[in-house]
Design a protein with these regions (language model features):
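Hydrophobic/aromatic residues within transmembrane alpha-helices
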Residues: 33, 42, 46, 89, ...
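Glycine-/small-residue-enriched transmembrane alpha-helix faces in small-molecule transporters
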Residues: 1-41, 77, 85, 143-170, ...
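Transmembrane alpha-helical segments that form core, pore/gating elements
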Residues: 28-29, 50-54, 109-110, 146-200, ...
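C-terminal transmembrane-helix exit sites in multi-pass transporters
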Residues: 53-62, 86, 105-127, 143, ...
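Helix-helix packing/entry segments at the starts of transmembrane helices
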Residues: 43-45, 98-104, 167-190, 222-258
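Specific transmembrane alpha-helical segments of multi-pass solute transporters/efflux pumps
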Residues: 22, 26-27, 55-102, 109-110, ...
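C-terminal-most transmembrane helix of multi-pass membrane proteins
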Residues: 2, 14, 46-47, 136, ...
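Hydrophobic transmembrane alpha-helices of multi-pass small-molecule transport proteins
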Residues: 54, 73-75, 79, 121-141, ...
């Protein structure tokens, strides 16, 4: 089935899957960068450069007003808090665990859509939440090191990203996608800089490896991925988008194994698998309903 602007459902799915792959690979990259920089210093650099790169192609006139302005500020706040808590959590927890916990945002998205927009995701959501909760327990059980502060920060990140999935779906159909992306990126840069001044004693060790990680994070995770997400989600429901995001922790775990040598125990893989199954159970019925629409 095609869309008014010529984008097919399959093209939209593949576009979002590419963004999901790139975001999945970023966990290991950022984990490596945090050996050379404090979290807020890294985020401030990453998103400030990304905002500058996006600015030339962004239309700032007419200036945003009303619902677009409120939506842009909301997106900026959600992404800022999400990335700050995710990056701070990565200092403490592993990239693989972080990716599986962040992926719970896909389970939370239908719940948030129900709470805020009255969009009923179906009875499987409760079962999916139960599976995800059990998955978190197995992933962070005492034998696996227990639930640490990094995991808790990452849970906050998952809630923010779940809300962002819903907000992008609602706002992306009405307003200029690139401008909304710039709101998210610039908002994260500003909030990170303010938090840096208040909460952190910044440290950056400049090296070739750090610059490569920064460049990868800026070009792919902070600009390309957001543009791909905004472009793709104009043509799908938040539930369908959340279903595609289910692949992110798998990409992240594979990259963390290849790049960082991280390995999960069998019980942790079982926990991660339950989280992914929970996401699929929560999102697939609504995604099928959207695909069978008029």
């Amino acid at each position: 089935m095609g869309h008014a602007d010529g984008v097919t459902r399959r093209q939209a799915d593949l576009t979002l899957l590419l963004a999901t792959f790139l975001w999945g690979t970023t966990f290991a990259v950022v984990k490596g960068a945090l050996a050379s920089a404090t979290p807020l210093a890294f985020l401030t650099l990453r998103f400030s450069i990304a905002a500058l790169l996006l600015a030339p192609g962004t239309r700032f006139r007419p200036p945003p007003a009303g619902r677009e302005l409120r939506g842009g500020l909301l997106l900026g706040a959600l992404v800022a808090v999400g990335f700050i808590t995710q990056t701070a959590g990565l200092v403490i927890t592993t990239a693989s665990r972080s990716a599986f916990i962040v992926a719970i945002s896909s389970v939370l998205a239908p719940v948030i859509a129900l709470a805020l927009l009255g969009q009923r995701p179906g009875w499987l959501t409760a079962a999916a939440l139960g599976m995800a909760t059990l998955g978190i327990y197995l992933l962070t059980a005492p034998d696996a090191g227990g639930l640490n502060r990094g995991d808790l920060l990452t849970l906050v990140c998952a809630a923010c990203f779940g809300a962002q999935i819903v907000a992008v779906t609602e706002l992306g159909r009405e307003y200029d996608a690139r401008r909304l992306v710039w709101f998210q990126v610039a908002g994260t840069a500003i909030v990170s800089a303010c938090a840096l001044l208040l909460l952190e004693r910044p440290r950056i060790h400049w090296s070739g490896a750090f610059l490569a990680a920064l460049a990868y994070s800026v070009v792919f995770a902070s600009t390309t991925c957001f543009l791909l997400q905004m472009s793709a989600q104009r043509h799908m429901s938040s539930a369908r988008a959340a279903l595609i995001f289910c692949f992110e922790p798998l990409f992240a775990a594979l990259t963390s194994w290849l790049v960082l040598g991280e390995r999960l125990a069998m019980l942790q893989w079982l926990g991660g698998g339950l989280i992914v199954l929970g996401m699929i159970a929560a999102d697939l019925p609504a995604s099928r309903a959207a695909a069978a629409g008029p």
